[in-house]
Regions:
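Active-site core of metal-dependent hydrolases
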Residues: 194-228
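Divalent metal-coordination and catalytic microenvironments
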Residues: 13, 28, 33, 54, ...
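Divalent-metal coordination cores built from histidine and acidic residues
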Residues: 74-185, 189-199
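Active-site beta-loop-alpha junctions enriched in small/polar residues
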Residues: 67, 156-158, 204
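Short secondary-structure transition/capping segments
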Residues: 49, 100-105, 211-214
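Active-site environment of divalent metal-dependent phosphoester hydrolases
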Residues: 69-71, 96-99, 203-210
Length: 228
């Protein structure tokens, strides 16, 4: 390529290209935000040069199990993940999350996440804009939030069960009626159409050997009690 055809050249790093090929020392050229060449590249062909001597060059890692659902609103790097080469995180794991959450259930949602994921209550209260009710509106709020990391949002089953059955009935494990089942299915379909990458649930029945994670008041989480 002609001179100055690259925006950035990362020089002399140990390249792990993500294909399973052996690591190799070399350079990586980037143009328009995309990798366009690897190998030995003339540094004069780039607008900017990064010396990666003694460092590794690798694709961004994906953290499939996180609970940055709230933290992303005040921490664009989703630390600590963003400090360790992770460029994409999945949120909404374990059936926990903040959408759909009606206004009168916000307090419960924050208390619950304080208990099960040790997210400071005051951080959530002050850091989240709470400008949503539905999952689609939550994703819109995420889109408006400056971020330095990609977000893969699971649709958490807990808030859907709470929304449709009510908190007490969801925790009691009541079987949804046909109409409620249809509403749950519609809610999930709409959430997936809005951008959900999947759905999640925690299954730790209170009588089972793994019954270690309870809600803020000591009762089971809604998805622990849901019917198959």
């Amino acid at each position: 390529m002609a001179s100055q055809d690259y925006d950035v050249v990362i020089k002399d790093g140990l390249i792990f290209d993500g294909t399973g090929s052996p690591r190799r020392r070399g350079d990586v050229a980037i143009s328009d935000g995309k990798i366009v060449a690897m190998g030995r590249i003339d540094a004069s062909s780039a607008t900017s040069v990064i010396d990666a001597s003694g460092m590794h060059i690798a694709p961004g890692f994906v953290d499939l199990h996180t609970h940055y659902d709230a933290q992303v609103f005040w921490d664009p790097y989703c630390t600590l993940s963003g400090w360790h080469g992770i460029t994409s995180v999945a949120i909404g794991n374990c059936g926990f999350g903040f959408a759909p959450v009606a206004e009168d259930m916000r307090e419960y949602a924050m208390k619950s996440m304080t208990r099960v994921e040790a997210i400071p209550y005051e951080s959530m209260k002050q850091g989240m804009p709470w400008d949503w009710v539905t999952f689609s509106e939550y994703l819109d709020s995420l889109d408006r939030t400056p971020k330095a990391i990609n977000i893969l949002p699971y649709v958490p089953a807990g808030p859907m069960l709470t929304e449709v059955l009510g908190l007490a009935d969801a925790k009691a494990g009541r079987m949804p009626t046909n109409d409620e089942h249809a509403r749950l299915a519609q809610m999930l379909n709409e959430s997936m159409d809005a951008g959900g990458c999947g759905w999640s649930a925690q299954r730790l029945p209170p009588t089972g050997p793994a019954a270690v994670q309870r809600d803020w008041d000591g009762t089971p989480m809604p998805t622990d009690m849901m019917n198959d």
